[in-house]
Structures are given as C-alpha cells and as structure tokens.
From Swiss-Prot:
Domain (GH18): residue spans on this chain: 36-304
Matches recorded under PROSITE patterns: GH18_2
Carbohydrate attachment residues: 119, 295
Protein name: Xylanase inhibitor protein 1
Keywords of the record: Disulfide bond, Glycoprotein, Glycosidase, Hydrolase, Plant defense, Secreted, Signal
UniProt source species: Triticum aestivum (Wheat)
Any single GO CC term annotated in Swiss-Prot or TrEMBL for this entry: extracellular region
Source organism phylogeny: Eukaryota, Viridiplantae, Streptophyta, Embryophyta, Tracheophyta
Cited Gene3D superfamilies: Glycosidases
SS bonds (residue pairs): 55-96, 194-225
Stimuli inducing this protein: By wounding, methyl jasmonate, and by E.graminis infection in leaves.
Any one GO molecular function term: hydrolase activity, acting on glycosyl bonds
Active site as annotated: 158
Chain segments carrying region Interaction with fungal GH11 xylanase: 178-184
Length: 304
C-alpha cells in the first residue's frame, strides 16, 4: 500500500496518483461509518485565537484545552494555556457549550512535571480537578474559569511509570460523570501514542473500561507506527482491545509535518480504513493553531 502521509510537497502529486490508483473504487468512495465528529486541541499557541473563535468556526464537535501539566506527589498544580488570557476563557467555555460544543481539559502533555505515584495522589488530583474546573466549590481551591463547568477530562500521558495510578483517577471521575442533571456526562477520554500495546500506566487506566473515547496519535515520528508505516495494524489492535470505546484517528493540521496527510488521502485511504471498525468515533486534530493556518478541518470534516 502506498504511504498515506505527504513527506514533502514535491512528492505530493506522486502520492496522490498512487493513492488514486489504489483506492479509487466504489467501496472507497462510499466510506461508510462516518460520524462527522472532529475534536481539536486548543491552548498550545496564543496565536491560535480565542476558544470562542474556535467554537464559532463550526468545524469542531469538541474542543480539548491543553494542558494541566504539573500535578502529583508534590501537591502542586499548573495550568499552561500558552499565554491565553484566563479571565476570558470562562465566558468562552459557556459560549461553546451554548453552541453544543463540549470543552474538556487535557492533563499531562509533553513535559515531565506530572506523576501519580499513589492512590492518595490520584485522589488529590481528582479533588483539584473537581473543585477547580467542575462541580466542586471548596473555598481554598481557586477556579481559573470562574463558575464555568467543563465537560470532560482527557489523559495525555506522554510520560509515566508502571506505578502511576491513573486508573484510580479515572474511576473517581467516573463516579461524578453526571453534571448539571440527567444526560450530561463528564466525558472521559485519552490521547495515546499510535503504537500498541500502550505503556503500562496508560494500559492500567484504559483497563478500567470506562473511557468514552481514545484519540490515537498517528501523526508523530514513532518508528513503528505512524502515517507512513504500521498505523493500520495498530488501529486494528486498539479498536479490538477496547470494543466499548470510541476511537478517533489523530491527524496533524500542520502541512509542513512529515506526517501530514493530504485531504484526498484522508478520503481515499485513512477514512475508509478507520471506518471499517464498529467503534470508529471520528477525527482528532492537532491542533487549533495549525488548523487556523491551513483550514485543514474545513477540508476533512465531511470525511470524518
């Protein structure tokens, strides 16, 4: 099979020609199983514009803010939204929710300032999350977004050890998965590396069986699993291992990345493969900043 990612703009036409020759069939064109679901990460670059602007674009069905990047044994917490004015984010969250776009918070990220080495640290993190961003109201816990109430938590656990207790955190969050009345869940998601099986600390959390969705990052330079090599086999394993969880294909909107996939290749290659699975959920985009530059979501949304 031809590689799906565009390695260089110079070879783009060649890639498209090969993809068209391989995939231009009635089955590929039908591309069943579409959901129209597109999740985007927001908060990694101040130049990406406001959260309100992202929701008003009409391109996304969920926005994940990133990251709460410090937590764990030392009892300290840090929210990094890349210099965005936090005083306006609360109103933007409510605006997004009024438009039917849920907003979640991703914890972890690419830094190394987090861990959950014990049950106690996991419960302490839950307490911080619940009182800072959800339904809690401890006077001693500041609320960065005022009385805005988020819709979910995403685990983006790039670093960790087998001792980390993200399973305890997930189970505690699941006990509080109704916000504001019946039918309003606290969405519990995870954003994982492409390769399967996952690292031990991620696998232990997912083994709880309570994650609503998982975003599989196929756009990074993982030697054994990326858009040039191996992602389809890993996709099969991920979706089979957790049949009750919805899986999202993670794509980059950065057209300068070696792992960027041309929209036509999403249509002819990525979407038909991903949508064969009964628990296909949609597409996750990294991230709003790149998408604003390239308008990638406007080109792939209707293939999702």
């Amino acid at each position: 099979m031809a590689p799906l990612a565009a390695r260089r703009p110079a070879c783009l036409l060649a890639l498209l020609s090969v993809a068209a020759a391989l995939f231009l069939t009635p089955t590929a064109l039908a591309a069943g199983g579409k959901t129209g679901q597109v999740t985007v990460f927001w908060g990694r670059n101040k130049a990406e514009g406001s959260l309100r602007e992202a929701c008003d674009s009409g391109m996304y069905t969920m926005v994940t803010m990133s990251f709460l990047d410090v937590f764990g044994a030392n009892g300290k917490y840090h929210l990094d939204l890349s210099g965005h004015d936090l005083s306006s984010v609360g109103a933007d969250i409510k605006h997004c929710q009024s438009k039917g776009v849920p907003v979640s918070l991703s914890i972890g990220g690419y830094g190394t300032g987090y861990s959950l080495p014990s049950n106690r640290s996991a419960l302490d993190l839950f307490d911080h999350l619940w009182n800072s961003y959800f339904g809690g109201s401890k006077p001693s816990v500041p609320r960065p977004f005022g009385d805005a109430w988020l819709d979910g938590v995403d685990l983006f656990l790039e670093h960790g050890t087998p001792a980390d207790r993200y399973d305890v955190l997930a189970l505690e969050l699941a006990k509080h998965n109704i916000r504001g009345g019946p039918g309003k869940p606290l969405h519990l998601t995870a954003t994982v590396r492409c390769g399967y099986p996952p690292a031990a600390h991620v696998g232990r959390a997912l083994a709880t069986g309570i994650f609503e969705r998982v975003h599989v990052r196929t756009y990074e330079s993982d030697k054994w699993c990326n858009q040039n090599l191996g992602w389809e086999g890993s996709w099969d394993k991920w979706t089979a291992a957790y049949p009750a969880t919805r899986f999202y294909v993670g794509l980059t909107a950065d057209d300068k990345s070696h792992q960027w996939v041309h929209p036509k290749n999403v249509y002819y290659g990525v979407a038909p493969v991903a949508q064969k699975k009964d628990n296909y959920g949609g597409i996750m985009l990294w991230d709003r900043y790149f998408d604003k530059q390239t308008n990638y979501s406007s080109l792939i949304k209707y293939y999702a």
